């Protein structure tokens, strides 16, 4: 590849830069604790990770004290509401370890919703839309632009349509 994911992995300090510097709010990220830095970041990898528990507990993983309204808003932005509402238990639906009982696209939308529920300053989407169909991808990007306009969004994507209006 061209180093897109490597560059993205430098921001939350999964690796430290060997030359130069990366600044967040004008501060070299090496001068900020990893915990403090990662509190500012909502990171969604290409393969969304889910944990055993409920949909609700998965969405609260980054912000345990999120309100019901915040959780529902995050799901709506991530285009997850429609499939959540079809489940008999809705947000209390059990998720198997690794999310084996939901589709790839549903897993990605839940991982995206979890990052949104955290309400960080910076969102990093590392090819996080790849399992979404084109319509869902477009609707999700529009919602991100409308609802998260005060945040920094970094999007790595294979599809040119994903980043055209990012």
Regions found by a protein language model. Give the residues of each.
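ABC-type nucleotide-binding domain
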Residues: 1-166
């Amino acid at each position: 590849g061209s180093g897109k994911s490597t560059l993205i992995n430098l921001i939350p300090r999964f690796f430290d830069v060997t030359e130069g510097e990366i600044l967040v709010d004008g501060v070299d990220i090496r001068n900020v604790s990893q915990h403090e830095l990662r509190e500012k970041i909502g990171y969604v990898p290409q393969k969304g990770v889910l944990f055993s528990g409920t949909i609700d507990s998965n969405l609260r993983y980054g912000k345990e004290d999120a309100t019901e309204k915040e959780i529902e808003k995050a799901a709506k932005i991530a285009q997850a509401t429609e499939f959540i509402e079809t489940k008999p238990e809705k947000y209390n639906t059990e998720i198997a370890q690794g999310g084996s009982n939901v589709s790839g696209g549903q897993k990605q939308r839940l991982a995206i919703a979890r990052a949104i529920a955290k309400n960080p300053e910076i969102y990093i989407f590392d090819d996080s839309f790849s399992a979404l169909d084109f319509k869902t991808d477009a609707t999700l990007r529009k919602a991100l632009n409308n609802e998260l306009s005060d945040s920094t969004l970094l999007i790595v994507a294979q599809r040119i349509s994903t980043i055209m209006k990012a």
